[in-house]
């Protein structure tokens, strides 16, 4: 039987683009692990993606996951849009390159053999784990230490 894991995620950006961070909480039974990091220049969507990626990449075996995010971009991207992006060689319906393709590809790879249920939660609405992830993300964004090498400012 697969382990049942809960993951909660959030991303934050102080300015968009600007310094950003992500926060994630992973819970298995009574065990809990948190993840966060801050980047000097990035976007809120990239940080939302990173939160999910880092938590999923930390799983050491195939799991049944409920992943909660307040990002419609992440939830819709992974449950709806990604299938056509892949069919079109990572291009949008308008034949433009998919934004944040480096992270979408990394998230796609991180899904692995996991069975994942994507849940959307309303942000800043008192959801305890989402609020904690928001705090982790904002604290990381306030003290960025990393460069988001995949971030490509729009020209």
Curated annotation (Swiss-Prot):
InterPro entries named among the record's database cross-references: RNase_H, RNaseH-like_sf, RNaseH_domain, RNaseH_sf, RNaseHI
Positions of the RNase H type-1 domain: 1-142
Entries under PROSITE patterns matching the protein: RNASE_H_1 (PS50879)
Binding site for Mg(2+) 1: 10, 48, 70
Residues bound to Mg(2+) 2: 10, 134
Localisation per UniProt entry: Cytoplasm
Name of the molecule in the record: Ribonuclease H
Organism of derivation: Klebsiella pneumoniae subsp. pneumoniae (strain ATCC 700721 / MGH 78578)
Gene: rnhA
